[in-house]
UniProtKB/Swiss-Prot annotation:
Protein name: 5'-methylthioadenosine/S-adenosylhomocysteine nucleosidase
Pfam families linked: PNP_UDP_1
Name of encoding gene: mtnN
Protein source organism: Staphylococcus aureus (strain Mu50 / ATCC 700699)
GO molecular function: adenosylhomocysteine nucleosidase activity; methylthioadenosine nucleosidase activity
Active site: E11, D196
Amino acid sequence: MIGIIGAMEEEVTILKNKLTQLSEISVAHVKFYTGILKDREVVITQSGIGKVNAAISTTLLINKFKPDVIINTGSAGALDESLNVGDVLISDDVKYHDADATAFGYEYGQIPQMPVAFQSSKPLIEKVSQVVQQQQLTAKVGLIVSGDSFIGSVEQRQKIKKAFPNAMAVEMEATAIAQTCYQFNVPFVVVRAVSDLANGEAEMSFEAFLEKAAVSSSQTVEALVSQL
């Protein structure tokens, strides 16, 4: 069983509509769609936006469906200036950009008693990288950071870049999903696409290009599923 998590309806609808033998259940106001995609058993959930929603949905998915791997799909704001709308983002590490326990000796972004970063599954990273090469998509592997804020100003962007110079993208769920997977020992990878450039025009760009980002990320996830 392969678990796929997206925060918004636009981020999961494309994949959900491709499921055969579709079945739907709801647990704690979270909808889960099970079926067959590329001859593989999958469960897709729309988690809702933000870290708590993501953690709840991931926990429910793991407990009820026992997935072998989890893929987080959707959109993100680019922090790397070489990225453009529609480019595919593949996580190697994910971190929180809004966690601060430095007073107790932890690194900025680190939750106490948790790793500095949550590492994606190397085999999954390799498979996604192969998929995007085959599809001739522009993609980048790197650090994705998460927090409970939509990054829509130059000031917000600069603050994150100062704290995490190597971060390529920012969004609102991936690290919570990753932390949950870490605690349940489930391999994960984040496969998203750029919807905006996390700057003063981010809100307008996000609304205009969310669909393009959803198509790019969904295409990649569908191809990845066929390889698992």
